[in-house]
């Protein structure tokens, strides 16, 4: 039987894609199992090389003839870590400069106006890509009748290095994401999508990027709703901090006060090697983040939310996993055998003279935890939970409806030591628990389909303009949180972290 590939007629030119059938068991009886049309590796901007390195993206030009869109484009230049290899079923890639592409999943390239969901991947602003197997959008498109888009954007030194003689540097990766959203506005109707119903969603650095977008005036109107998984508005960098990072990179390159033109002439591999040397020298786990004070991101996102000067979506869904930091602390040999005094010593960096009281509080909340797990719980709140609470408060004050969740299902990996760690919810959101790589992260757990379908459906409902669950109220002074789990603790919980918040000087 001769099956012709799907074709999309976009304003930039024609695209030839592939047809993909969904797979996996049906947990809740709503799976359509209809095939979807997939278009991969679509350029949304020119390759950021030469004078475009560190500069804002330049939109991709139109083309003539039929363009093949059957292969993912290369990732942004990077040195993948352990998690990225697991996410993609073990594949290792270092990427290429010509990386500014996106991918589209749709049930049909017709005249329907389906909701659109644009995924921004995580990876500490250093790694990742839109073609990772966990991010396959087939289930969203087939079951939820949404058009699913994943994107690549510049990472690390290429996306977030601040240079004094390049005024738009420091936010190039964020500008890439916004340019991809402009592409969606101009082209998504050709894939059966509605440019007026765009939901942007992401995890970790992807969610943190969305948090930054909430402070970008030029992003207003590019998306209507936002979903922020394990990231809020706290991960931005001042210009002074950014200058220090630039100096560290220049030291690693053996340069003093390098200009943008000098750095544009250095091979990408050499810049990556210098970046890796920076990481080995210690310091921040997020050495590159969007930089404040430029034309794209003039003020802190929380201030922009309060002032009404940023993107201002109509609604936000956001949350965390229960044990975020265990993804990192479970492998930390320095925590093996740590005692209470050791945790207090670490806590002084954040809490000063009150460190002992804070550690005592967390120990009383988690009496069965070992001291390493107590420390991990404190860091989970510091890095993820408290910023999520701050975001919820800012949105409530600004009159933007928001819903908060916690994902509490623990992976059995490493004998259960990782718990419900950072990133573990991703295959559940995409309903891809059977994708290659997911089993490495989820361990030998069985019967995950129902929880996966529930979480996927909540995201689909939200993209269609509804509350994520009929019994899940928007945030108010009672701080409702929806707990995702496959046991009897699942469902609505009111203000589950009131005691923890007390030691972070929040009400």
Regions found by a protein language model. Name each.
Residues 115, 191-203:
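Alpha/beta-hydrolase fold nucleophile elbow
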Residues 122, 172-176, 204-207:
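Active-site loop->helix "elbow" adjoining a glycine-rich segment at hydrolase catalytic centers
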Residues 168-189, 247-248:
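Alpha/beta-hydrolase active-site loop
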Residues 186, 220, 229-345, 374-397:
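Substrate-access "cap/lid" subdomains that shape
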């Amino acid at each position: 039987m001769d099956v012709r590939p799907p074709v999309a007629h976009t304003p930039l030119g024609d695209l030839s894609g592939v047809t993909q059938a969904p797979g996996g068991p049906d947990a809740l009886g709503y799976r359509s199992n209809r095939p979807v049309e997939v278009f991969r590796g679509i350029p949304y901007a020119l390759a950021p090389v030469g004078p475009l390195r560190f500069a804002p993206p330049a939109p991709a030009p139109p083309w003539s003839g039929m363009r093949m869109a059957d292969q993912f484009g290369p990732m942004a230049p990077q040195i993948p870590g352990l998690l990225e290899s697991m996410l993609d079923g073990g594949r290792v890639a270092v990427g290429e400069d010509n990386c500014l592409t996106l991918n589209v999943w749709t049930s049909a390239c017709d005249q329907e106006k389906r909701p659109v969901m644009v995924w921004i991947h995580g990876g500490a602003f250093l790694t990742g890509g839109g073609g990772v197997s966990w991010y396959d959008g087939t289930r969203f498109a087939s079951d939820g009748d949404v058009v699913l888009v994943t994107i690549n954007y510049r990472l690390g030194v290429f996306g977030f290095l601040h240079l004094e003689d390049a005024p738009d540097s420091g936010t190039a990766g964020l500008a890439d994401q916004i340019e991809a959203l402009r592409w969606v506005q101009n082209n998504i109707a050709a894939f059966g999508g509605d440019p007026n119903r765009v939901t942007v969603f992401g995890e970790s650095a992807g969610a943190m990027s969305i948090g930054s977008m909430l402070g970008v005036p030029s992003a207003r109107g590019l998306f209507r709703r936002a979903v922020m998984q394990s990231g809020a508005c706290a991960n931005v960098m001042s210009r002074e901090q950014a200058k220090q990072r630039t100096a560290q990179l220049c030291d690693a390159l053996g340069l003093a006060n390098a200009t943008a033109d000098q750095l544009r002439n250095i091979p990408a591999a050499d810049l990556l090697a210098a970046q890796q040397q920076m990481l080995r020298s210690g310091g921040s786990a997020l050495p590159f983040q969007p930089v404040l004070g430029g034309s794209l991101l003039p003020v802190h996102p929380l201030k922009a939310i309060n002032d009404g000067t940023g993107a201002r979506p109509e609604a936000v869904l956001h949350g965390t996993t229960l044990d975020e930091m265990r993804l990192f602390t479970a492998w930390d040999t320095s925590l093996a055998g740590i005692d209470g005094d050791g945790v207090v010593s670490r806590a002084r960096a954040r809490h000063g003279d009150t460190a002992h009281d804070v550690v005592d509080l967390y120990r009383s909340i988690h009496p069965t935890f070992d001291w390493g797990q107590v420390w991990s719980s404190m860091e989970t709140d510091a890095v993820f939970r408290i910023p999520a609470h701050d975001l919820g408060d800012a949105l409530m004050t600004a009159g933007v409806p928001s819903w908060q969740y916690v994902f509490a299902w623990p992976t059995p990996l490493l004998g259960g030591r990782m718990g419900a760690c950072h990133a573990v919810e991703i295959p559940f959101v995409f309903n891809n628990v059977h994708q290659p790589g997911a089993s490495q992260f989820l361990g030998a757990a069985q019967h995950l389909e129902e929880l996966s379908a529930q979480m996927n459906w909540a995201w689909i409902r939200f993209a269609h303009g509804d509350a994520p669950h009929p019994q899940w109220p928007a945030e108010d002074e009672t701080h409702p949180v929806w707990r995702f789990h496959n046991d009897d603790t699942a469902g609505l919980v009111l203000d589950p972290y009131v005691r923890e918040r007390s030691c972070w000087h929040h009400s």
